[in-house]
Amino acid sequence: MLIKVYGSAVFGIEATTITIEVNIDKGIGYHLVGLPDKAVSESSYRISAALSNNGFKLPGKKIIINMAPADIRKEGAAYDLPLAIGILTASGQIKSKNIEQYIIMGELSLDGSLQPVKGALPIALKAKEEGFKHFILPEKNAKEAAIVNDIEVLGVNNMTEVINHFNEKEQITPTVIDTQAEFYKNIDFPEFDFSDVKGQESIKRCMEIAAAGGHNIILIGPPGAGKTMLAKRLPSILPPMTLQEALETTKIHSVVGKVQNTGLIYQRPFRSPHHSCSDVALVGGGQYPQPGEISLAHNGVLFLDELPEFKRSVLEVMRQPLEDREVTISRARFTITYPSSFMLVASMNPSPSGYFNDTNAPITSSPTEMLRYLSKISGPLLDRIDIHIEVTPVPFEKLSEERKGETSVSIRKRVTKARVIQSERFKDFPMTHYNAQMNVKQLNEFCKLSTESKLLLKNAMEKLNLSARAYDRILKVSRTIADLANEKDICASHISEAIQYRSLDREGWLG
């Protein structure tokens, strides 16, 4: 008897429906074809044990299973459940009524219980798109899949529940979530607040500009100056995520199995990988491709603490994603693109000792050591960071103040107003949402300068020997400063402030 059941495979952040054809005929043997990997090939052992431990058995006949399309490699143990259901249906142990309306996924334990799978959200989206009515998967993934409306999500804890469901002995209660209502109910501010930061008013101003225009920023200062504290509070002043952004973000995190039992991600991601991470961990890839940190930070913040401590090769692979807002992983058999529209926040000490330019500490690093230290960060990478700012230690008088600083809520209101201005400006440009994303044509249209501003910028370019990319960065930051001031035109004062935020371009940085 030939039976078809349906599962799904995830490539990148998109799913592809897999047809599992099970044929049982005279003879003996278990044959699984259709380009399965080792984990899928081993499924027969898990299925046999799970069936035996739940009062069922493999039929004593020849079982041939084809997983189509055959040119796509099937990876992982998430096909255990659909394979088991297909075998039971083909052997007549469970009813096959309406089974073609189901997508089924789940990894079996030997006792028949189910382990969570990766990519439940993209699978649910694809199932809805292709007209499937029901999606059976492990209970731990049910909230995640139920984000998708108009498909019945059936979360189960073990194989027996699925068998009883098809045999009409018991019904599985669907998991239902009103996605929009849940989203708007759970939008909340992150746990960190800028009011906790004593002093550092000029740095807070930089962070506000960065948040308003989506600009990348690097903080340079000695240990204990507050760089990490400031960076962790940046998400608290970014505009709340839209529902579409929340779905995009959740989809990426679903692929790596990071949203089990949680459902929709409501707050902007903040990712802070250790400086020992590899280039694959940062940008994604591997033998079985997975999103890297830059994609997990999509629609949020990627914080690279102690930037020069990262391997130079690791930092260099990030250059293109910073420009393109996506990363493409190419291999002989496939090409996968992951979104990576994130704000980069980096921090670093000004020298190996950490105290260069600190008048209260002795300089213990030689010019050669400092040059070697800073050379780990290439010029092209620095050019892609819009704002460079020096962070100095907070004096005792400021630390001992009881008065709290401005709250994140207050700063966020100004940032959101600036973003509204940008949304209106770029309404006819679907790929551009804020100033940091402007291309050359948009710069020429929206960043026109007066004669005074042009002269000021020309002098800065010549004196600091700035690159063409740095020129573009200054214009973008100036445009954001003008938006925060609710001014239509870019003034000389806006250009002047933006030039100040190119610390690492200044002559004499190394003394």
Predicted features and spans:
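Peripheral, non-AAA+ core regions of ATP-driven protein-machinery
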Residues: 1-218, 222-228, 330, 470-471, ...
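Short beta-strand elements
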Residues: 18-24, 282, 386-389
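P-loop NTPase nucleotide-binding/switch module
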Residues: 170-209, 213, 240-294
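The Walker A (P-loop) glycine that initiates the GxxxxGKT/S ATP-binding motif of P-loop NTPases
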Residues: 221, 284, 306
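Walker B catalytic acidic pair
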Residues: 299, 305-307, 317
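Basic, amphipathic alpha-helical bundle interface domains used for macromolecular binding and assembly
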Residues: 39-44, 59, 66-76, 288-289, ...
